[in-house]
């Protein structure tokens, strides 16, 4: 079952207790085990266990007030139905195994009556929508009929929105209504719809208007997680300069001691730590500097806090826009030390970190060789850093005809600390170069950086097949900027 994580550490039987506030009956699930799971973000976690009697009846004890939110009752299969535990309500619900959600009867609980009435309403609207879609396909060659169907389709959306708003107005103090209201996106004012840019910024600034960021219950529903993911990865323009202030403004609206703050900071940090979009690791570094180093991440134990800070600090040196250290390594003779700043004068340098035994490196290297051999212009050099310094390295270079600056660290530098120290004190190289895996955050190969004439990082973690397109776009942008400055 999607997203359900259970830690089944329990013993003994859980009997049906008449005084329990949450009572259920599932016809068709007699004499079996049932689990209660709580949402935290998008995932479900084990919360409690019950056993059904001969009629499929069972119950759960009351939860703590600080654990209110959306839950799921999980039956064998596994199959489950959702419910809301909030506002101190007693709950009485019954259904059957033929359709746990569709056949649900809510006998007691305003919140769950709200939720299941809404589910039934949406199900009916979905059927209407599907019919309209089919009619639209049948009438695609009849403009007038198609336009009429589109209008009906738009009316359906308006009806759903009106229903959602009405529920909120009718039940202002019920979490079930608040959860439905959370799913509504803010509507851009009519006067701004014609101005795309103004409309976008209004929408971004008001994105969380329908969510009470002071209510910790929202992190125990999947809706807040979904809204947060959409905001971070789609709503806000995907550059550090726009993301960082938007994130800080959002978090500033939260109580630092709240579950909402904890969830938002934790997920946002993880999201950009694992992002595949080039340059967004800067957002991860900002999150660690702002919320972890300052002692605000009180939920982190000492070891985990130390690890995330170390990881962030390692990434700082290789953020987009940073000038790299003067990487200076030895060629295949082990005698000539080549500096990317002192000895290479080309406008651009591609740093290519690889391992001759790495399977992916074996595939990418010939592509890089082909790209370089057919590259038009003399403004590019490739500084290829091998993790191996043996004959295997030389064979790899010869086999692939790598007409690059082929460099590595001589074996003796690994074997003798005195030798390594002399290399530094005599100016042959530097500490950052001998520790280049740490300096450039190399935890897997191949790894690519594109540097400009000042050896500033302009691109990183891209594929070999992307280098050419990136350089073309970068040169065009630089040319336009230069022209604009001259004018």
For each feature predicted by the language model, list its residue ranges:
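Bacterial Sec-dependent N-terminal signal peptides
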Residues: 1-25, 460, 478, 484-487
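A non-transmembrane, solvent-exposed segment enriched in polar/low-complexity residues
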Residues: 18-172, 181-210
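Surface-exposed loop/edge segments in extracytoplasmic proteins
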Residues: 42-49, 336-338, 457-458
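N-proximal helix/coil linker or "cap" segments that precede and/or mark the start of modular domains
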Residues: 274-331, 342-346, 485-487
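Short active-site neighborhood of thiol/selenol oxidoreductases, capturing the structured segment around
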Residues: 338-368, 381-385
